[in-house]
Amino acid sequence: SSRRRHTRFAINPKLIKDFGDNSLRKVKSDKADAVKIARYTLDSWTELRQYSLMDEIRNQLKTMNRQFDFYMKHKTAMKNNLISILDQTYPGANTYFDSPAREDGSQKWVDFSATYWHVDCVRKLSLNAFIDHYQKWCKRRKYNFSRSKAVEIYEASKELVSILPKDDLTKLIIKQAVEQLNTASQTVEQLRTMMNEAASKLPEYPVVMAMKGVGKSLGPQLMAEIGDVSRFTHKGAITAFAGVDPGVNESGSYEQKSVPASKRGSSTLRKTLFQVMDVLIKTKPQDD
């Protein structure tokens, strides 16, 4: 059917499920569901807002954010897997560099581990030979070269003990782990870029991006989980939606003074809010 002939609404199914639920009988059929949807729509007609292009973008953004969260967990698992293997071939190799992932998902410590996958790849060379090899590697991979860093890596390699031998089988194990991590990391960075592009089409984008503690990654994530902010009538509604509103425990004359947050809302939104607050605590912006 043509979109022009129908008015479309996006409604939380939980609202429909709980609507008019005042019968002792529990009926579950397509006919009963259709009647319930119709009754809810007629009863709430004046409050419903028509589904729009902005809603489609928000739905896409939220879907991408859930995928982003999934692949971030996968990336963390692949990272831990690679580190556990490196502990048996080149302990500490993952700690030499802390530069963030590039747009293609590549990371210096991962690329370093792919080339110098065993500690013997470093210490079997002379110091000058390693410095020369490392410098050429940095140039080829377009990473910054530091002679002092090269010396530090070489000197540290003399004290390390490897468990797995330096052979083709061990190299293959490392290669597979690196490839899996790179694939997950690349997907994460692609989603990060796509989410920012989608979020930039929404009217609230400039306001959100101007907030302290929010950047091109957390900003779109925040927008994805909150959705259309205009549907909230007051600030308390947003805190309740996130589940960070204080709970209430009262009965008769008893009133609990300290009650944990309700946590009835979106756990993904709470996670994003926690990350924003973590940035604020660490950066401590003066004019915030």
Predicted segments — roles?
Residues S1-D288:
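A detector of single, family-specific signature residues
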